[in-house]
């Protein structure tokens, strides 16, 4: 069975003195991805002193809407400080999809052609930015510009994985540039 890696979180600041860490969750399935015993690939940021390459979840709990995770390899606050900024990846079957039909893994969206609602080509999806309010699709236009499109139903009404396309309810300034002001 072919597998791929998906980004599931980024380690934040330490919580307490026993090595618990806050987690910037990048998955819609945190209870599954951070279940005790789960093994994740650790990707330290450039310049990090951390030598962690794999971590095993010891425990996970919610505290005031923040996920706190303890890893077998992180025993104390000093080790937790060194782990800050590490990206965590889970291995999933290549054909896996999230349980919710309106949710997608990043790799399912990257490479899709982007069209407006009339069928005109806008470019292609080159990435996603995971933000606080909502995720953003990065759409590379034919002229080489990158546009950030909020990944919400009102602006992205259709995702057709089989057809390898997304439909964007474009408006001036979203993907297409604003019209030139003729008064200058």
UniProtKB/Swiss-Prot annotation:
An individual GO BP term: rRNA processing
This protein's record includes keyword Chaperone: yes
UniProt KW Ligase keyword: no
Subunit structure, as described in the record: Binds ribosomal protein uS19.
NCBIfam families: 16S_RimM
HAMAP family reported in the protein's UniProt record: Ribosome_mat_RimM (MF_00014)
Family, similarity comment: Belongs to the RimM family.
Identification of the protein by name: Ribosome maturation factor RimM
Organism in which the protein naturally occurs: Nocardioides sp. (strain ATCC BAA-499 / JS614)
Lineage: Bacteria, Bacillati, Actinomycetota, Actinomycetes, Propionibacteriales
């Amino acid at each position: 069975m072919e597998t791929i890696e998906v980004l599931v979180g980024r380690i934040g600041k330490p919580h307490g003195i026993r090595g618990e860490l806050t987690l910037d969750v990048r998955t819609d399935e945190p209870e599954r991805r951070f279940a005790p015993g789960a093994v994740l690939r650790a990707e330290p940021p450039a310049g990090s002193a951390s030598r962690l390459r794999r971590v095993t979840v010891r425990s996970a709990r919610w505290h005031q809407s923040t996920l706190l995770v303890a890893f077998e390899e992180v025993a104390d606050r000093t080790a937790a400080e060194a782990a800050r900024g590490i990206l965590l990846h889970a291995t999933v079957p290549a054909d896996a999809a999230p349980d919710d039909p309106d949710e997608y893994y990043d790799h399912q969206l990257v490479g899709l052609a982007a069209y407006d609602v009339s069928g005109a080509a806008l470019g292609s999806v080159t990435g996603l930015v995971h933000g606080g309010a909502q995720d953003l699709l990065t759409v590379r236009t034919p002229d080489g510009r990158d546009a950030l499109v909020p990944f919400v139903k009102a602006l992205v009404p259709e995702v057709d994985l089989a057809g390898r396309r997304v439909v964007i309810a474009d408006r001036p300034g979203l993907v297409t540039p604003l019209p030139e002001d003729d008064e200058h």
